[in-house]
């Protein structure tokens, strides 16, 4: 099997910094695995890597879609697998777990619901409530930041199918070394708060305003962008928006960790360890020695 490496973890856990160090050490190119960072203009609010931060490391499937473009996990699976075949040793970086799993495992996808019109936030919330009642086990594994995944699960339940009880293929297609950067929840919260303040200083509110102005069909059902949009509509204050963003980010991080541990079973690393880089390099060297 072809070897693949992935670095995952919650927002503000240090994925970007570690990935650049690893890419430079092993002369690798990076495949982005953050579903939001694939879109242009969503820069500040997604903490998208900058040219300076990339330090010359080539990134694929990053910043290549116009806001509002119909692109989802179905297309990503195909594009990412093509990239894997083009690289000696691909390095995936990002926290979109289902996207990563769809690529690395024998995950069957169909292009259904690719060209549906935008879904309102109220409709999404109603669908989530319905899913919780009908199939509670599914919620822990569902990407609640992705309206299309919510709609797909909702449609399955309407047809009488409990998706959590489906027999899916989980056979690996590649020999994968997947790292998950774990971090103490209280420290993570402090980092999230600090990062949000930095985003606001960099112009996060103006970024949302620009996207809304020039791309009215763009997706705003995203943590951070949704709250800033509501702020711009005058429905909440800045302090309320900040509180909501922090709260929802932490809730998502908790679900994210549960999902990765149950679905992918990655190698969990201490994101705050002073030996993180050294440990990661050692594990990769051992991985590359195996057949």
Swiss-Prot record:
Binding site for substrate: 11-16
GO BP terms, alphabetized: tRNA modification
Keywords: ATP-binding, Magnesium, Nucleotide-binding, Transferase, tRNA processing
Coiled coil: none
Site (Interaction with substrate tRNA): 96
InterPro entries: Dimethylallyltransferase, IPT, P-loop_NTPase
UniProt-listed Enzyme Commission number(s): 2.5.1.75
Catalytic activity: adenosine(37) in tRNA + dimethylallyl diphosphate = N(6)-dimethylallyladenosine(37) in tRNA + diphosphate
Keyword Chaperone: no
Cofactors that this protein relies on: Mg(2+)
Annotated signal peptide: none
Stored Gene3D superfamilies: P-loop containing nucleotide triphosphate hydrolases
Entries under Pfam families matching the protein: IPPT
Binding site for ATP: 9-16
Region (Interaction with substrate tRNA): 34-37
A GO MF term: ATP binding
UniProt xrefs under NCBIfam families: miaA
Family the entry assigns: Belongs to the IPP transferase family.
Chain's role: Catalyzes the transfer of a dimethylallyl group onto the adenine at position 37 in tRNAs that read codons beginning with uridine, leading to the formation of N6-(dimethylallyl)adenosine (i(6)A).
PANTHER family: TRNA DIMETHYLALLYLTRANSFERASE (PTHR11088:SF60)
Subunit comment: Monomer.
Name used for this protein in its record: tRNA dimethylallyltransferase
Organism: Aster yellows witches'-broom phytoplasma (strain AYWB)
Name of the gene: miaA
């Amino acid at each position: 099997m072809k070897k693949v490496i992935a670095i995952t973890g919650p927002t503000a856990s240090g994925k970007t910094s570690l990935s650049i160090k690893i890419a430079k050490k092993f002369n690798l190119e990076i495949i982005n695995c953050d579903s939001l960072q694939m879109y242009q203009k969503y820069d500040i609010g997604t903490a998208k890597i900058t040219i300076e931060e990339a330090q010359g490391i080539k990134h694929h499937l990053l910043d290549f879609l116009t806001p509002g473009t119909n692109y989802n996990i179905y297309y990503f699976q195909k594009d990412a697998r093509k990239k894997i075949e083009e690289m000696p040793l691909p390095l995936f970086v990002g926290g979109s777990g289902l996207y990563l799993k769809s690529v690395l495992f024998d995950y069957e996808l169909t292009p259904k619901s690719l060209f549906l019109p935008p879904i309102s936030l109220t409709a999404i919330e109603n669908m989530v409530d319905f899913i919780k009642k009908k199939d509670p086990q599914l919620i822990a594994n569902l990407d609640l930041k992705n309206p299309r995944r919510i709609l797909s699960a909702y449609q399955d339940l309407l047809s009488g199918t409990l998706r959590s009880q489906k027999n899916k293929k989980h056979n690996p297609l590649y020999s994968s070394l997947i790292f998950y950067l774990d971090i103490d929840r209280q420290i993570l919260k402090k980092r999230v708060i600090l990062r949000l303040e930095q985003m606001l200083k960099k112009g996060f509110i103006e970024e949302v305003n620009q996207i809304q102005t020039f791309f009215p069909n763009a997706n705003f059902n995203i943590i951070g962008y949704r709250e800033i949009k509501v702020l711009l509509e005058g429905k909440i204050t800045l302090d309320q928006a900040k509180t909501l963003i922090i709260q929802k980010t932490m809730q998502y991080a908790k679900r994210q960790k549960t999902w990765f541990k149950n679905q992918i079973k990655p190698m969990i690393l201490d994101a705050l360890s002073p030996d993180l880089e050294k440990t990661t390099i050692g594990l990769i060297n051992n991985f590359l020695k195996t057949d």
